[in-house]
């Protein structure tokens, strides 16, 4: 009979909501009870799972910190009857007079991103995160002190004969925290996480954690959040690696899961979920983001303008997958420039997905606006002013329906348009949530094709194949105002996500005139983007929390 100890560990992949201490605590307790019933001895809940991530300036409110402390104690009491079970919970920790972590600093209260060990009805120990990310969407140094300011350099907890070292997210991306845990006797590394999704992030995580496992010679368990929080999506995919960095277990992506992993000091074993395709991950992120933003904020449903174009068609498809057809309403608002095929395709799409579809002509309102402004505009030709009036009339109609019925307006503009300002302030930009804000136009087409390939074909073929147009004047197409989307999106990728300058982008083979124009448009339209609704982040550089450029600036790379 083998003398090698074996412990069942549960990775409690929950969908937390910021500020819902009771609800999040209940999810942690429920997951722990379910895991205990399956023989687990150790349960890992994600980073800041108790309060949700990111809590932002809630952390600066004393009442919030006090409530978090009380909720943690409450979880410990709720789990007291589960004999021998150890639960690790992520939460914010305020060091006060009754704190169980003593500060090396003098006469100041410190706030930490922490992980506490709950067992036998009490909070037995607390570890404080050492490495605080302060890039992209992260602002942790604004809120937290480093665990280096505590007297506990590492936390190792013995469960079932195995010593588990506790780390928090960014800690595992650096050498020192893991080495401190190993020096303290850890035989397995446990990393609790709140790591926002972007395309390619799961592979990046697994590669970095595999390198950490190999460097330390220790298995590594990675517990992660799932679900949406404002513009951020957490993709789940919690996993377990053996000491050689091989994946031995992986939870489902983009949904709550409880992964039970059999762990020894060298090996891990559990169910390994597949990794979806890039398109499937992008789709799941959009669906998750819409569903959780709408549901967590208590909206009864969504409303959007359906134009017969590909962007609004894709948003409609996402919304139906996220919420169900009964909670989605779309409105076609034709103008004198709306092609008959746009009407036909919009109605066809709405019928295919089974949503409520209404038509409201903007012609009477458009004519009234032009008549009211005729004296002021006398002698001046029609231009973008009249085009923008149409977009703003549509926004007024959608917002009126939103006010009357309570549904939130989904905007339908994409990242390529948002970058270049090819959108109307207080027009098509008006709404509560921008589904495609981080989806470039070329990816819009890929996702439309992917969605149809899953069957049944819900986006009419002509919507995908016809040239895109705002239909705000006769015979208008997007390419009259913008470079081809393949060129535009390649420039955006290099300029936004890779931080390349104009000369580097031109050297890569992209036309100088287009590069100069697009980068200028990005700069001069910053004021527009500041007034846009938030939208789902799916790349590692989105217009939102991780794009913080000044509006007034003379610099252009």
Where are the model-predicted features located?
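Enzyme catalytic cores with a strong preference for nitrogen-chemistry domains
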Residues: 1-305, 316-325, 332, 357
């Amino acid at each position: 009979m083998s003398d090698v100890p074996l412990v069942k560990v549960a990775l409690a992949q929950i969908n937390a909501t910021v500020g819902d201490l009771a609800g999040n605590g209940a999810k942690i307790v429920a997951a722990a009870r379910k895991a205990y019933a399956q023989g687990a001895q150790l349960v890992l809940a994600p980073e800041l799972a108790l309060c949700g991530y990111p809590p932002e300036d809630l952390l600066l409110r004393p009442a919030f910190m006090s409530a978090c402390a009380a909720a943690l104690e409450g979880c410990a009491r709720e789990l007291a009857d589960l004999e021998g079970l150890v639960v690790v919970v992520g939460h914010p920790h305020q060091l006060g007079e009754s704190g169980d972590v003593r500060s090396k600093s003098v006469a100041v209260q410190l706030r930490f991103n922490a992980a506490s060990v709950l067992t036998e009805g009490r909070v037995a120990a607390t570890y404080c995160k050492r490495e605080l990310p302060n890039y992209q969407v992260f602002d942790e140094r604004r809120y937290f002190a480093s665990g280096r300011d505590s007297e506990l350099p590492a936390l190792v907890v013995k469960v079932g004969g195995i010593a588990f070292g506790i780390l928090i997210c960014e800690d595992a991306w650096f050498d020192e925290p893991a080495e401190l845990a190993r020096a303290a006797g850890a035989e397995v590394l446990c990393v609790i996480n709140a790591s926002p999704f972007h395309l390619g992030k799961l592979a990046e995580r697994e590669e970095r954690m595999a390198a950490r496992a190999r460097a330390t010679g220790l298995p590594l368990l990675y517990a992660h959040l799932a679900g949406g929080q404002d513009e951020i999506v957490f993709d789940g995919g919690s996993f377990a690696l053996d000491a050689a960095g091989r994946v031995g277990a992986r939870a489902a992506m983009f949904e709550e899961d409880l992964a039970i992993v059999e762990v020894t000091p060298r090996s891990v074993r559990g169910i390994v979920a597949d990794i979806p395709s890039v398109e499937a991950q992008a789709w799941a992120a959009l669906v998750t983001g819409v569903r959780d933003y709408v549901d967590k904020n208590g909206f009864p449903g969504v409303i959007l303008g359906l134009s017969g174009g590909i962007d609004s068609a894709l948003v409609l498809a996402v919304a139906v997958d996220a919420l169900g057809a009964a909670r989605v309403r779309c409105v076609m608002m034709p103008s004198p420039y709306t092609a008959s095929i746009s009407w036909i395709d919009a109605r066809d799409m709405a019928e295919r997905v089974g949503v409520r579809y209404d038509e409201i002509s903007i012609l009477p309102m458009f004519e009234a606006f032009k008549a009211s402004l005729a004296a002021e505009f006398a002698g001046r030709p029609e231009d973008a002013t009249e085009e923008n009036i149409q977009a703003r009339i549509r926004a007024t109609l959608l917002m009126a329906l939103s006010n009357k019925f309570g549904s939130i307006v989904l905007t339908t503009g994409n990242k390529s348009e948002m970058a270049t300002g090819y959108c109307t302030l207080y027009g098509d930009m008006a709404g509560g949530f921008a589904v495609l804000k981080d989806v470039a136009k070329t990816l819009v087409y890929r996702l439309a094709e992917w969605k149809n390939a899953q069957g049944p074909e819900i986006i009419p073929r002509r919507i995908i194949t016809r040239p895109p147009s705002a239909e705000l004047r006769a015979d208008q197409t997007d390419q009259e105002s913008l470079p081809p989307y393949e060129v535009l999106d390649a420039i955006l990728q290099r300029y936004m996500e890779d931080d390349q300058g104009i000369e580097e982008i031109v050297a890569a083979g992209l036309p100088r005139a287009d590069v100069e124009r697009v980068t200028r448009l990005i700069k001069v339209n910053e004021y527009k983007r500041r007034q846009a609704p938030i939208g789902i982040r799916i790349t590692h550089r989105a217009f939102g929390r991780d794009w913080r450029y000044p509006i007034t600036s003379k610099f252009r790379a």
